[in-house]
From Swiss-Prot:
HAMAP family: Ribosomal_bL28. Keywords: Ribonucleoprotein, Ribosomal protein. One of its GO terms (biological process) is translation. This is Large ribosomal subunit protein bL28. Belongs to the bacterial ribosomal protein bL28 family. Disulfide bonds: none annotated. GO terms for cellular component: cytosolic large ribosomal subunit. It comes from the Bacteria. One of its GO terms (molecular function) is structural constituent of ribosome. Residues 1-21 are annotated as: Disordered. The keyword Ribosomal protein applies. It comes from Cellvibrio japonicus (strain Ueda107) (Pseudomonas fluorescens subsp. cellulosa). The keyword Ribonucleoprotein applies.
Length: 78
């Protein structure tokens, strides 16, 4: 399963670990992904999404139906 938020599109980025001696080694900064089930009243079923806490706040603000319509418009299956 890919490490991408289904709502915001946030994905891993790369950077460096920096030691006290200023040595740089490659690392990945991973998004804080959570798996969450949402009840969709219009479809009378649960929808499971993999999203970040910011994605959850967006759903709280806009509603699950509006966010699902946006996800489906991008061609993702939910």
């Amino acid at each position: 399963m890919s490490k991408v938020c289904q709502v915001t599109g946030k994905r891993p980025i790369t950077g460096h670990n920096v030691s006290h001696a200023k040595n740089h080694t490659k690392r990945r900064f991973l998004p804080n992904l959570q798996t969450h089930r949402f009840w969709v009243e219009a479809e009378k079923r649960f929808v499971t999404l993999r999203l970040t806490p910011k994605g959850m706040r967006i759903i709280d603000k806009l509603g699950i139906e509006a966010v699902l319509a946006d996800i489906r418009a991008r061609g993702e299956k939910v």
